[in-house]
């Protein structure tokens, strides 16, 4: 509630009209909370497969009936009401992961790991095709949930390395990257003693797969990424203050950093932000809402907000760990990890550490779909954590 209240305050500073609409979304979210508490936790487990299939149906249908917004065909629009099925996908996938993993242990179980992989790949791939890479990246948060349940840390490290390799390969010659990989592997062999034949075969396979991935990364980037996605990634390696970039692809990042930096230690004061008040930062009510915090509340206000988020997420992890049933624990960790990934990527976006990929700040940014999605995620978990004696159904 503190974050929602603080978010409304900052929205009002940016746009009073948006703040009034957000207040309506907040009031309507209490309806979802009421519905959630009508049901026993076991009911959510029973409807999970049907909800997941319904979500896939919506994600496929958006290609035919969806509206193109900001280059992505990811919204259903019904008059003045719009709905993004990728938000529902976060809920249904969290439930489905918990449903499957409460029945199958993924530790040393390739069959269970395959089932989980299919569940994760289907919605994230459909969302990526829209194309909405930001929402698709959020699904990587489930790797943290899988790690808690026994997934080897190697899988996560490989995933992160492939992302790093992709970014490096589109900015350097793939041949240079392959040469660096080769030198690294040779250096590793000299350090490691008594390598078995199977280990040698595995490392050679890794080198070949990394090399092939690096070689084709620039081709994939140029052919399959839309221009605005390429611009948002490329600007991370350029100087946004350069005249060549500051008036186009670097505009968002330039004024985002300017707004945050101008707040200094204590901020300019509520509703006294010159950059945000001047509406220099595009989407400052959604993706870039943190700029308002940095400018008006300064370093102190920004740190306090981040601490609130971390305490909030830590509390979710604590409640997840104390769950007596596996379903509740896994779902709780999924909720916490989704919020954590949103927080990290959103803060990284406004500070130029990540490309702008449309990731909102949970319970803070403007938007009904995202607010309702986070509300439903959180309160289903709260309902699972609470006693089921108060259920009406």
Label the predicted regions.
Residues 2-5, 9-248, 294-351, 376, ...:
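Hydrophobic alpha-helical transmembrane segments of multi-pass inner membrane proteins, especially
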Residues 291, 302, 333-334, 362, ...:
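Pore-lining and gate-forming transmembrane alpha-helices of multi-pass membrane transport proteins
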Residues 132-137, 266-273, 284-286, 357, ...:
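Transmembrane helix boundary and interhelical junction motifs in multipass membrane proteins
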Residues 247, 254-297:
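Long extracytoplasmic/lumenal interhelical loops at the membrane interface
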Residues 346-393:
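A juxtamembrane structural motif centered on a specific transmembrane helix
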Residues 83, 255, 363-364:
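Short hydrophobic beta-strand that contains or immediately precedes a catalytic carboxylate
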């Amino acid at each position: 509630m503190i974050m929602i209240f603080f978010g409304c305050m900052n929205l009002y500073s940016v746009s009073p009209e948006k703040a009034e609409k957000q207040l309506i979304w907040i009031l309507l979210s209490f309806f979802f909370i009421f519905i959630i508490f009508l049901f026993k936790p076991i009911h959510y487990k029973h409807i999970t497969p049907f909800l997941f299939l319904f979500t896939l149906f919506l994600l496929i249908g958006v290609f035919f009936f969806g509206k193109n917004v900001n280059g992505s065909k990811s919204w259903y629009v019904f008059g003045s009401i719009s709905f993004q099925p990728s938000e529902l996908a976060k809920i249904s996938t969290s439930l489905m992961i918990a449903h499957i993993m409460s029945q199958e242990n993924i530790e040393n179980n390739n069959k269970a790991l395959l089932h989980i992989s299919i569940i994760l790949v289907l919605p994230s791939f459909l969302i990526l095709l829209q194309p909405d890479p930001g929402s698709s990246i959020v699904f990587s948060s489930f790797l943290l949930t899988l790690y808690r349940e026994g997934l080897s840390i190697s899988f996560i490290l490989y995933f992160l390395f492939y992302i790093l390799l992709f970014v490096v390969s589109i900015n350097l010659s793939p041949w240079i990257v392959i040469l660096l990989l080769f030198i690294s592997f040779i250096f590793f062999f000299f350090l490691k003693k008594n390598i078995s034949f199977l280990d040698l075969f595995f490392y050679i396979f890794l080198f070949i797969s990394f090399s092939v991935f690096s070689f084709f990364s620039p081709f994939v980037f140029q052919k399959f990424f839309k221009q605005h996605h390429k611009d948002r990634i490329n600007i991370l390696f350029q100087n946004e203050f350069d005249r060549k970039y500051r008036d186009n692809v670097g505009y968002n990042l330039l004024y985002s950093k300017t707004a945050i930096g101008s707040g200094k230690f204590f901020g300019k004061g509520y509703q006294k932000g010159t950059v945000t008040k001047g509406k220099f930062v595009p989407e400052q009510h959604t993706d870039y809402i943190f700029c308002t915090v940095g400018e008006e509340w300064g370093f102190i206000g920004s740190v306090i907000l981040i601490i609130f988020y971390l305490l909030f997420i830590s509390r979710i992890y604590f409640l997840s760990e104390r769950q007596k049933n596996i379903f509740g624990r896994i779902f709780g960790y999924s909720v916490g990890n989704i919020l954590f990934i949103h927080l990290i990527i959103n803060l990284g976006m406004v500070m130029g550490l990540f490309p702008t990929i449309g990731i909102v700040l949970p319970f803070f940014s403007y938007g009904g779909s995202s607010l309702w999605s986070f509300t439903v995620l959180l309160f289903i978990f709260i309902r699972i954590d609470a006693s089921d004696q108060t259920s009406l159904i």
